[in-house]
Amino acid sequence: LMSITGVPDGEPGAGPVKVGVAVSDLITGLYASNAIMAALVEREQSGRGEYIDLALLDSQVAALANQALNFLFTGQSPQRRGTAHPNIVPYQAFPTQDSWLMLAVGNDRQFEAFCRAAGRGPLAEDPRFRSNADRVAHREALIPEIEKACRQKTTAAWIRLLAAAGVPCGPINNIAEVFEEPQVKHRKLRFDVAHAK
């Protein structure tokens, strides 16, 4: 995981970076809870118990998902790309006037909508960027254009504009900002409990 996490080689600050939380532990716990539920169903149906064998390594290798598949199909180890997705462009963080925006353009229709909303219509018509495969192949030409566009507005302005256009995006919040997010409050993801003392 660390080999594909961090700043790309050749850029300032390059090198592997630890993920900000104990992701292997969390994923293994989720896999374990699913395995336990499946074992309980089996016991209920057949009366037999199950032996669950799960290691952190198993979970981490499984969690490599598309990155592992990229390697298995091509034989080439994926490289670090910072916040960029290896197979979808543009799908990464961009600096705005005041902070950062995570842009998640998952298909050609969304790319066209982004270009129109950003006032960069010609990008959608450029043959280098017509399909996702084209955008992946010409990533180095496209990303600087999107960076220029994103720096023209605040993150909040982009979120309003792109939400109206149907383009997935969101702010990159620090932890304090996370707990102030309206949806986090609505979902009651923070709650206070009384301490014994």
Predicted regions and their residues:
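Active-site-adjacent "lid/gating" segments in soluble enzymes
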Residues: 1-105, 112
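Short coil/turn segments at secondary-structure boundaries
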Residues: 17, 84, 127-128, 159-163, ...
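Alpha-helix/helix-capping structural signal
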Residues: 59, 109, 173-176
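A glycine-rich dinucleotide-binding beta-alpha-beta segment and adjacent secondary-structure elements
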Residues: 164-197
